Amino acid sequence: MEPGPALAWLLLLSLLADCLKAAQSRDFTVKDIIYLHPSTTPYPGGFKCFTCEKAADNYECNRWAPDIYCPRETRYCYTQHTMEVTGNSISVTKRCVPLEECLSTGCRDSEHEGHKVCTSCCEGNICNLPLPRNETDATFATTSPINQTNGHPRCMSVIVSCLWLWLGLML
């Protein structure tokens, strides 16, 4: 057999395998996000979140999420996932939020038809890709301390203590 037809079959099978793999995937990957993140931001520390209101599932939410920056007064990406007891999605809501809306993450059973509602928050650019499905996923993930206080008083006390120690050694 000549190498030409065999190579053509190999390429055709490879293309078919890629098409089948793409057709089966109904979720976004981190690789997809690379195309959503431009190199400039409208303000220092600007970030984006997937945003949608009551989408049917995670795919529909992430697929149609507007590609815009979060308002300056927000800092976190919020996700609320309502699902059946079987785990099938009923609705997905994602948005940019301030700290106050992230203080009650976790899962709870809804009194409405036995549904489960899981809520999560995260800090970072487009960090709300996955859905919270259980207590392990329904967390508040932050990359910086929530209680950020001005560190100068502590630094000053350390500096003064070091100066006193140094002066004591010099005398």
UniProtKB/Swiss-Prot annotation:
Output one GO MF annotation: acetylcholine receptor inhibitor activity
The protein's predominant localisation is secreted
**Which branch of life, at top level?**
Eukaryota
Keywords, A to Z, come to: Cell membrane, Cell projection, Cytoplasm, Disulfide bond, Glycoprotein, GPI-anchor, Lipoprotein, Membrane, Secreted, Signal, Synapse, Synaptosome
Location(s) in or outside the cell: Secreted; Cytoplasm; Cell membrane; Synapse, Synaptosome
> Pfam families, per this entry?
UPAR_LY6_2
Q: What is this protein called?
A: Ly6/PLAUR domain-containing protein 6
